[in-house]
Structures are given as structure tokens and as C-alpha cells.
Amino acid sequence: MQTLQKLSNRLFYLPPVQKTDRPILAAIVGDDQTLLIDSGNSSNHAKHFKAQLASYQIKGNILALTHWHWDHVFGLSEMNMPSIANSMTYDKIKEIQKFSWEDKELDERVEAGIEIPFCADAIKLELGNEREVVIPDPTIIFDGKLELNLGGVTCIIEHVGGDHSPDSNLLYIPEEKALFLGDCLYANMYAEKWHYTVEKMEKLLEKIEGYDAKIYFLSHHPGPLGRDEFGSFVSLLKICGELTGKYSGNHKAIVGEMSSLLGRKLTEDDLEVVGYFVGGYE
């Protein structure tokens, strides 16, 4: 089981679990309120997070969702506190509240193209035989941007969208220079080909770079990224996006010039990013 990590008196996070697609969960501890980031992918995930927080005498008061995907909202009922979502996330939650998560219905949605095998398999693994999922309505609904004063520390929540999920939010903690990006920099998985689009990526990176952060959280990355490491990832995305436009999505040409620009052979991760941009080029 994952152990809660303390980065400061204000900032704690629980690392992700790849096998069952558990994302990072986090707590921002203010003098008056404690904000939790995402609810987890099951009641068990949420319970584990709450127990880990309790070992530091921390209890959440309010929770913010990064987006609507199952692994971020299935723990919402167990969290049992007011929650914050943008209106797009709210609408998607209302939609999936009606779903059954039993094998038969999951498999039917995969067959219909509503669900994807990756998520269906992870849901079956995480939930086991406990398939009754209750997702309560989010409490506070916003559009655009919202600022929270937790007492001695603040949080800015901004709806930024992106390829992965149009409802994606980022959360910025100015006093900690910490930026939680949820899944917004990941590819669109609900498509025939997992992909990035050049235009959406450019707009998203512009918004992200407007925040003065020194520590960055991607929900399924093992731990936070420092400024240099995150900057390298952003540079890769920018170069790949530019070359995708320049070469009209020609994989071979993009790989050739990218390798030349970087002065090295591309890694598997590099090639995955190239593949996503090529997959999204129209």
C-alpha cells in the first residue's frame, strides 16, 4: 500500500498505483480548511487516503476534482464532504451516475465505444466484486476560475481543458509554488487512436506556463517533477507539436528532425509522444 508523502506542513500527497490506475491524491492543509485533490478510484482508495491523513492528524473539509474520469471520482461518496467541479465535470458525472459497473454492462459499453478496454479492465481489478458505485453530485460548480482561501494558504482552480478530457482543471498553490495538473497533459484515450492535437496542446501549455511553479504533479506519474524535469517534458511536447505541423503528421520526417534537434536517438517515451501527435493530426 502506498504511503503518504509530506513535502511541507501544507502539502501532502499519496503516490499513484499503476496496476489499478489509482491516481495521485493530495491534501493542501490550511489554518482553517484542508483541501483534498481528487477522491480516488474506489471507496477503498479513498479510505486508505483518509487513514494516511489521519496518521498526521489531518482531516479534509472540501475536495476538488481535476476531471470526471472514473479513477478520480469513484471515491467521492466515501470522502463524504463538499466537492468542487466545473460545470462540464458536473454534467459528465450526472451522465455516469446512471451507469452500472457490472461486467456485462461494462463490456457492452466497451463494445459500443463508450468505454475503453484499458479503463474497464482497471475498474474490474480495483473494484473486484464490489461494483455498486455511488457518485454524489458535486457541491460547488464553477466556470473558468475559482480561488479558495484555506487560511494561510490559497488555491487557484482553473478549467484548462486539453486533449485528455475537455473538462480538465489545474490547481495552483501559490505559497508552495505547486501545480497539480491532473491528467490534462495526457493523451485523449477515448478515441480510435490515443492522440494529442497540436492546437489544443499549444493552448494548454500557454495556460500552464502562466503559473510560476517549482513543483509539478501529473496524476499518474510516480511523484512530483521539478522545474527542470517538467521543462524538458514541455520542450518535448512543443518540439513534437511544431514538427507535426511542419511535416503534416509524417512520422518518419518528424522522428528524423527531432532526433537531429535533440542530438540523440529518440527514446520509447519520445516515440510515444510522436505517435500521439501523428495520431491526432488531421
Can you name each region flagged by the protein language model?
Residues 2-51, 169-183:
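Conserved beta-strand hairpin/beta-sheet module of binuclear metal-dependent hydrolase folds
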Residues 6, 95-158:
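Metallo-beta-lactamase
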Residues 22, 43-44, 68-74, 90-93, ...:
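Active-site environment of divalent metal-dependent phosphoester hydrolases
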Residues 36-40, 61-69, 84-87, 159-161, ...:
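Active-site neighborhood of phospho(di)ester-bond hydrolases with catalytic His/Asp-centered motifs
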Residues 44-89, 212:
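Active-site metal-binding motif and surrounding structural segment of the metallo-beta-lactamase
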Residues 79-84, 199-255:
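Divalent-metal (often Zn2+) His-rich catalytic cores of metallo-beta-lactamase-fold enzymes
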Residues 154-209:
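Active-site-proximal loop/helix segments of hydrolase catalytic cores
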Residues 245-282:
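C-terminal regulatory/interaction regions
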